[in-house]
Amino acid sequence: MSLEEKRALQNQILAEYANLASNLETLVKVLQDMVYNPSNNILDSLRDLEKEVGLVYTLYKASVWAILADLENNQEGKSGMFQDES
């Protein structure tokens, strides 16, 4: 390989590195924009998710309350049965 061929190859490699550096800078800018300025689609999705989680939490609390109320009623019913027998 002659000296001129080596220099041409070296210039091609340097050009590719410059292109890669430029692409990485563009990627960094896009990622920073995504981090600091979230898109409306992401925010809307998170709002919908927040509503669904709130609904599930409310239903869960209601279910636990219903179970505890049933247990309390069952215990009162059993204690009432024993009081009637005496």
Curated annotation (Swiss-Prot):
InterPro entries documented for this protein: DASH_Dad3 (IPR013965)
Signal sequence extent: none
Compartment list: Nucleus; Cytoplasm, Cytoskeleton, Spindle; Chromosome, Centromere, Kinetochore; Cytoplasm, Cytoskeleton
UniProt superkingdom: Eukaryota
Pfam families in the cross-refs: DASH_Dad3 (PF08656)
Keywords: Cell cycle, Cell division, Centromere, Chromosome, Chromosome partition, Cytoplasm, Cytoskeleton, Kinetochore, Microtubule, Mitosis, Nucleus
GO biological process, one term: spindle attachment to meiosis I kinetochore
CC annotations in GO: cytoplasm; DASH complex; microtubule; mitotic spindle
Family that this chain belongs to: Belongs to the DASH complex DAD3 family.
Main function: Component of the DASH complex that connects microtubules with kinetochores and couples microtubule depolymerisation to chromosome movement; it is involved in retrieving kinetochores to the spindle poles before their re-orientation on the spindle in early mitosis and allows microtubule depolymerization to pull chromosomes apart and resist detachment during anaphase.
Subunit structure of this chain's protein: Component of the DASH complex consisting of ask1, dad1, dad2, dad3, dad4, dam1, duo1, dad5, spc19 and spc34, with a stoichiometry of one copy of each subunit per complex. Multiple DASH complexes oligomerize to form a ring that encircles spindle microtubules and organizes the rod-like NDC80 complexes of the outer kinetochore. DASH complex oligomerization strengthens microtubule attachments. On cytoplasmic microtubules, DASH complexes appear to form patches instead of rings.
Official protein name in the record: DASH complex subunit dad3
Gene source species: Schizosaccharomyces pombe (strain 972 / ATCC 24843) (Fission yeast)
